[in-house]
Amino acid sequence: MSVTTNAVADAFAVFDVTPDPDELARKNKKPDDSGSVTVRQLYRYANWLDLILLAVGIFGSIGCGVLTPCQMLVMGDMVDTFNTNDLMKAFPNQEAMYDPKYYIPFNHEVTKTVADTINDLVLKMVCFAIGSGVGSFLMTFCFFVMSERQGIKIRMLYFRALLRQDAGWYDFHESGELTSRIASDVQQIQDGMSQKFGIIFQTTTSFIAGYAIGFAKDWDLTLVIMSMSPFIVLSMTLLAVFATKFTVLGEESLGNAGAIAEATIGNMRTVHSLGQEHEFCEMYNEKIRVVDRYNVLKGLTVGLGLGAVMFFIMGAFSLGSWYASVVLRGKGGKKNVTAGDVMIVFICVLIATQGLSIIAIPLNIFATAKASAYRIYQTIDRIPDIDCRSTAGECPTECNGNITLEDVQFRYPTRPTKQILGGLDLEIKKGQTVALVGASGCGKSTTIQLVQRNYDPVGGSVKLDGKDLRDLNIKWLRNQIGLVGQEPILFACTIRENIMLGARDGETPTEEEMIECAKMANAHEFISHLPEGYDTMVGEKGAALSGGQKQRIAIARALIRKPTILLLDEATSALDTQSEKIVQQALEKASQGRTTIVVAHRLTTVRNASRICVFHQGEIIEQGTHQELMDLKGTYYGLVKRQSMEEEVDQETVENDLKKIREQENKEAEEINQHKNTDTNEDPDIVQKLENEYNSEMKKLKHSNRFVLLRVILDNFRHEWFLSTFGFIGGIGGGAIFPFFTLKIVDLIMCLLSINSDTLTDDQKDTIKNICIIVVVIGVASFLSFFMYIGLFLSAGFKMIGRVRKDMYHSIMHQNISWFDRKENMVGSLTTRLASDPTTLQGISGERVGNVIHIISTIGFALGIAFYYDWKVSLAVMAVSPVLIVVVFINGKLNSLEACPAQAAYEKSGITLVEAVESVRTVQSLTREEHFYEVFKDALREPKIGIYKWAPLLSIFMCLTTLLTQVMNPYGFYIGTYLIKKKSNYDLPVPDFMIEFSDRFEEMQKAIMAVIFAAQAVGNLGNIVPDIGKAVRAAKNTYDVIDRKPTIDCYSEEGETFNDVKGEIEFKDICFRYPTRPDNSVLKGISFKVEQGKTVALVGASGCGKSTSVQLIERFYDPTHGDVLLDGHNIKDLNIHFLRSQIGMVGQEPVLFAESVMDNIRRGVPKGVEVSNEQIYAAAKMANAHDFISAMPEGYNTMVGDRGAQISGGQKQRIAIARALIRNPKVLLLDEATSALDSESEKIVQDALDKAAKGRTTIVIAHRLSTIQNADQICVIMRGRIAERGTHQELLDLKGFYYTLAMQQFGTVD
């Protein structure tokens, strides 16, 4: 089956030529500012195959819409067949009707003639039903295939457009908002293009055909009925305008909520450490409340609009009932109009107007799709000023690497009043290494970005080999550059793939070349010791690796490109001392023959630069070689002195010591491989236990959601009981309207059939009058019921979706960190599910519940009426119903099954989307936009193949649903006529026989009409079932998250708390494995104790377990063996919020949120604690951040941008330190807290941290040994074990591993 499906998919792919979006942007008229696109613009990406599918689908929809009222033509003929007035004209006189020799043959002949005529008409109706079934098949198949193809195509174009946008554009847009749109907006576009668009054509055509037939049969009667049309059109127009307005406003706020979700879910360690889960949930909830407010307004608008429409429709019928009697009395020479004609007019117009009630949902969905397309197409249409996809620009045959910055002036687009570079002049000749040093925020990294052409200068020019960068092809330019940034970005793939991503376009390095680059970056050794080697998955954002390991892989990725220009922005800041020395030598070697620009705070790494430029407030104030600047004794000299640099290292001695250390590590690694865990107290079955825990949890969740459909409905009623109760009443009442309305139509028809003169009898007048009054009452009831079951249920459904979205986000926010480490819970997957799954729940909530109640009520009342008037006919017709119900059920099941692989694929593509957009600058610097586009495209292959697998099945069962629904009508007439013929008393005189015949016809007609409405209701249920199937699947996914109880619950109120926390930390025989990597033991029996107020430093090579130890203290994870104690209390027994409120943490990669500087610092305040602005200023001063914050145009109210993109790395780090200090913690965890700071800031901040550490228990992870010399104890960790411990001097005297590290950093050691 899969082979055949793939073949069909590939065959269709031949025709899958997507129009170029740039060409379309030039040809198409841009969407206006109405917030919505036109229908033509909506289908702008349809190629000729899609247009054929659209045309055929519309043809099928029109066929369905036309054939349904056409069946009523046949029904009119059936009515006229029973016209007793015409039948009685066969008798010459009144006496003959009572003569047995006349009336007995006549009675037999009449029933035979009627039966034969009915049978012929039944055959015609069956043909119409078959035609409708074929039309339904074409509509379902074509719209399903076309909408899925368009959805996939728009997803790909939107993703490609996001990768294309320049850095300036991203400064104004949060990545979370952008990525959430692909899950919500694109899905809504796809829904609007699906079968629901076909239903609009079907109901519209049915409306037109119904009125057309009405005009053809009796134009003035139809015109009278249409007299209310202006009011109907006005109601529908106002409905559409306001519904679209509220949709646009709601979607904007939903995008803002998505941005919050992505920013927090992507940085859960920071959120948990700050204890800000509740605060972010409140922020998210506030955005969702705005969405709910607009959605409720939309729901009430739709309910009022449709209620008004139904009221005017019923008013039109009341007026028409009166005028029909006038027509049949022969007024105006219209005697040729029959009762059958009147019935045709009424039923056709009834079908036409009933379509208006059905069209509301698809119209609302279509309006939403157009509003969503407006936002998506705006992004797709945008051609950035710096276009990485542009083929324009010169591509020189060779690049020498001469870089010139001439009078460069620059301001960031988001801060146009803040001058970053003011007239910068800098010349770098081929092969030179130029170092940029200076305080954080002085313009060093900005210069790097200008050389990459992430931005263009606002004044002056940047040139390469004498050519302005703006005149060069952007892709060619970036292919000449290798970049290693301050915060290393890795992608969620293998180490091999991450390194290979650095290769130039069109080049595929060999395995040997890749390994050589890894060796140059000092990465090969640690990679080789990983269980999977180069095939090890690095996790989301490289979470499976330490900071230093990530940095080394990033360096290897840059080296494999063999760039002409090498840009190193703090390239070794995250490395341990041993790695830094080796990697620095590798970088210096790699720089030979290349133009290299180095941004560094560690001045030891730039001493050998050809030239060193000292930046200050966007200008170069000193430049020269190291020795020249030292002789100058200016700013650079002061920076060097602050770092306490001494004489050069004895290289030979260091290399010998490093060789010994490597031999020791390799020997230890061999012992570990031979005796895994035999020397620890860790449970030998721990690996199997970790796997069993995961499998057990998944099984438990699956079992708990078995009755998810009932749960959603009950949840809706429980929380929105007022709206749901009145909506339920409205649905029940609305279900009674059309069945009782059909009784009045039959009464009207029978009354009209009895008119045989120009004068109405008193009974006929009373009947007409009563019918008119009752229809008006039905109109009022329709207004109330439609408002209640559509408006109130729609509002309740929107509120439920908002509540589920909030509950889902709330649950995500309190999951333990190990849950986020799983592949299926990566940021892209979770944000995709958060955006799409609650929206899909509309299929089993809101107006869908109202529709189901309305349909069930209609079926119930209709069947009750049918059985009351003719149980035999009803029972015979109902024999078809079980088959119809089975078909409807299978149809829903198929839709649910079809949604599973598609949803999984969209989640997979969402992972690629989020990581590429979040790291778009890295993607663009690597010129790997097409690579990620292909990965994204490949992830969408499954739903693309699934289109051709599921479309035929779904279409067949939809065809059967339509066919069976419409066959019930002629089948009922056939059975009814048969029973009339069989039960007729032929011995009665003609008048009595005709009365009995007429009575039986009336009863049969009422029963059949009621059953027809019941069947149509089941058919309408068939249109809803596909959404129900998809919604059930989404509900299971949603409640999987909501129901999950984390092992470490940050919301839990359980656990001990105690006063007078001292801050004493103790590790007792700690063993640890990450749950997602149970085969890899990270910590192997570590024990140490940190007394109150003491400082313990953890040092060692990257990946040895230092940061893991800090995460255990924060209780991000629990150890697999041993205990972590706080003041003698096992932290597992402590309240988790209480524990974390005692800890202040500054991580290696600072995480800021898209809010003001003051709000970011305030994030450090524990829950329930109030701080003044003065306290915030004091914390900022301690972190040496107050001065640069105050210098910003808006001071502490300055927005830092998405993930702090608007400020430098050093500025981010200082704000993060201020955020930790304002907590006034008992325990201070500093994981490379000063790694991103310049020398001047580092000295001041280190003094501040030393001061802050007094009286506090402090655990420091640092590669710069100068920052930990005064620690009370230093623990040297090697491969998960403490190899050495002692004070700085004790470890130097030991002359072991620490001694070697010290020699590397300080040269000679006293």
UniProtKB/Swiss-Prot annotation:
Glycans are attached at residues 336, 402, 608, 816. Belongs to the ABC transporter superfamily. ABCB family. Multidrug resistance exporter (TC 3.A.1.201) subfamily. The gene is MDR4. Residues 403-642, 1065-1304 form the ABC transporter domain. SUPFAM superfamilies: ABC transporter transmembrane region, P-loop containing nucleoside triphosphate hydrolases. It is found in: Membrane. It comes from Entamoeba histolytica (strain ATCC 30459 / HM-1:IMSS / ABRM). The keyword Coiled coil does not apply. Residues 55-368, 722-1030 form the ABC transmembrane type-1 domain. This is Multidrug resistance protein 4.
